[in-house]
Amino acid sequence: MERRLLLVFALTFVVILLFQPLLKKYLPQPPAPKPEAAQPQSPQALPDQAPLPSAAKVVSGTPVAGKKVAAAPSNKQAETEAETVIENDLYKITFSNRGGRVKSWILKKYKDKPNGQPLDLVNSAAAGKYGYPLTLWTYDEGLRNKLNSALYVTASTGTSAPAEISFDYSDGELAVHKSYKFDHSYIVEVHASVEVNGAPVSAFPMWPSGFGDETTASAYAAGQIAYQYDANVERLAMKKISGGGTVPGPFQWAGVSDQYFAAVIIPGNSQSAALVTLRNQIEIPHKPSDKNDKQLDKVDVLGIAVGSLKGPTAVRMYVGPKTLESLQSVQVPGITGAEPDLRGIVDFGWLGLIARPLFLWLKWTFKYVHNWGWAIVIQTIIINLALLPLRLSQMKSMLKMQRVAPQIKAIQEKYKKYSLRDPKKAEMNEEISALYKKEGVNPIGGCLPLLIQMPFLFAYYRMLGVAIDLRHATWLWVPDLSAPDPIYILPIAIVITMFLMQRMTPQAGMDPAQQKMMNFMMPAMLGYISFNLASGLCLYWAMGQLIGIVQQWSLNQSSLGREMREMMEKRARKKEK
């Protein structure tokens, strides 16, 4: 029974690992909206909130109530395209006065690959089609295109933080002002105002085209859009994300992120804020590392635009890694509870109650060993030692079940002649239950340890999937604990240790042919799965099984283990006769 249950859990693990990629690949996806065909969408008012102005009214330049329409602005345009660089210890940003946009956003402390170059967060392939960071979104596509292609007049106070840079444009009808303020953190203060014939028009700063570390289909699949109001974080499912769909406020922050990096916008006025969700498609090489591979994959690129529906926009913008320390340093007014900051953008999943403490514990261990691989090894040893009583309980439960197995078989033979619908079958179950109670047998006692151990494995899988600290972290021969083992030593170790565990663990009551099949099928199946898993997870898995082998060997030498072995040999001899 235990082996069948283990198979069920293993198959469940397969489903969890493969569900999201299969969903994206095989289920029909809504067509990506074409920029040239986008239609203005009206934000919907939330309950207990006054109706918001329609997109058409906002775009048409309706003056803000109580304000006079200003005179037409004088011309202010640059003659040629030029670039300006702003940097601090964390990033180096290159602006172009063409649209007042960001051409590159380089994070100095992160690499594009192990021992590679500093990572550029601008996804150039997607940005070339759907827009660069810090361009402006308006509900009028024609106006939007003009805003993001005009040549702005640039002014800056310097190239090193603290610094400010501004972009201005006017042509007698349209007047645009954008300014950015930088300090020594990942936060940028953004101000934007657009007027058409003196009437304010809503224009939202954008992060429209994913991130520069996205090079594979799985990396794009990890993208998500989320926002937080009060203590509640809402994560939008892919099917709810459209090109230009509006989520009206109030909310304290809204962000787009991938596995390791995020762009989060904090509106100055949460009540009048609105979030525009962006989703487009591009084609990328199926195997980016293989220059001869001509196969292309279609992937979804996510983005956001956040601003005020009532005149000029003032926001703070966090662009950087999804480290808990960096996100915690950004205080957000209006959020209640224990975390009034941006840590909600990190999604530990439905096992977050286990995954997050595991990660904090892993970080604490890292402070003392200074290597993430050895921190995983130490944590795995402690977890398995803590679960040792469960292994002992499982063996005791199996032994008790085998002791009463002949009596259970006799009861089943007694009622064998009755059909399943016969009331007598109920009496059989009552007799078996009475026998269990008399002998102190818990029929699910052998399953309980598995039920407790599996969430730890799933939580570890989820935790390592969002822990940027393990990105490009090395251990012995492994160059990146967040990526698969390049020479497959860890997956092979999983196969070998699983096979040994199968051989050493008592398999009472199982048919020899079935036992032989399981001894080979389970290691082969789990080994196949592990070939594409992160090395950090494979290390945890293989190390856990290695410790399990030592524990199982010790249990097999105990009186309990000897009794179990003798009972199995006795039953095997009876079957041979």
Name what the model sees in each region.
Residues 83-340:
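Soluble non-transmembrane domains of integral membrane proteins
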Residues 57-63, 69-72, 154-160, 169-170, ...:
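Generic detector of short, locally flexible boundary/turn motifs and exposed helical patches
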Residues 23-125, 167, 171, 571-577:
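Juxtamembrane extramembrane loops of integral membrane proteins
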Residues 5-6, 36, 59, 69, ...:
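Small/flexible residues
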Residues 1-43, 95, 191-195, 207, ...:
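Helix-loop-helix
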